[in-house]
Amino acid sequence: MSDSAVATSASPVIAQAASGEKKVSTKKAAATPKSKKSTAAPPSHPPTQQMVDASIKNLKERGGSSLLAIKKYIGATYKCDAQKLAPFIKKYLKNAVANGKLIQTKGKGASGSFKLSRSAKKDPKPKASAVEKKTKKVNASAARATKKKSSTSTTKKAAGAADKKLSKSAPTKKSVEKKRADKAKAKDAKKTGTIKAKPTTAKAKSSATKPKTPKPKTKSAKPKKVVSATTPKKTAVKKPKAKTASATKK
């Protein structure tokens, strides 16, 4: 009796374990199709926001682009079914008008014509990814480190060159000072020699100049030629002709 009771009590436990294994297997089977959905091919066209903005920008209509024109442009350029994307396009148009990105020139809702606002016409700069930012930071830090190393090396070189210049300039300064001292001594010696010699030369000059008496120089006055103011010209005197025949006839 006891053995039969143990067998009956153990049988429901085994049944529960088997049912638990079945549930786990069904959960795993249900999880597998999700992974298949995640591996689905990405869409061949860009998001609707980008397609609508590009279509309005490239159509360049003065009165604004209509919904039909936007659909035709999207279907022709991106080669996708514009009818399936129509609800997404309408939703974006309404939100863009509310946000101020698009201007509705005609109609109401999504059935009118639309133009890009001035802020939307400017091409937005693409945001840099986190990886690019990290690489830029790493490159900047590396560049700073190299700059610091180069600056320290240059400062060390400059300090060494300055020390060398100082060591070279020190003896030159001493030699210059010695030369200056020698020149000053020579100048002093010259000054003392000239002061002593000056009175002797002055005495010699005075003795030499005293006996000499300057002789008055007399220039012989040359007789000046007297030029007569009016020199009388010699007048030719006519001689009287000898009376010959007339005198004898009388």
From Swiss-Prot:
What is this protein's function per UniProt? Histones H1 are necessary for the condensation of nucleosome chains into higher-order structures.
| InterPro entries xref list | H1/H5, Histone_H1/H5_H15, WH-like_DNA-bd_sf, WH_DNA-bd_sf
Renumbered to this chain, region (Disordered) spans: 1-53, 101-250
Localization per record: Nucleus; Chromosome
Return the protein name. Answer: Histone H1.2
Q: In Gene Ontology terms, what is a biological process of this protein?
A: negative regulation of DNA recombination
GO cellular component, alphabetical, reads: nucleosome; nucleus
Give the compositionally biased regions (Basic and acidic residues). 120-133, 174-191
Biased region (Polar residues) positions are 1-11
Its family remark reads: Belongs to the histone H1/H5 family.
Its source organism is Drosophila virilis (Fruit fly)
Compositional bias (Low complexity) spans? 27-42, 151-161, 192-211
In terms of Pfam families, this protein maps to:
Linker_histone
Q: Which residues form the H15 domain?
A: 44-118
Q: Where is the composition biased (Basic residues)?
A: 212-225, 235-250
- UniProt keyword annotations, A-Z: Chromosome, DNA-binding, Nucleus
Residues that span the membrane, as ranges: none
Q: Which domain of life is it from?
A: Eukaryota
Which Gene Ontology terms cover its molecular function? double-stranded DNA binding; nucleosomal DNA binding; structural constituent of chromatin
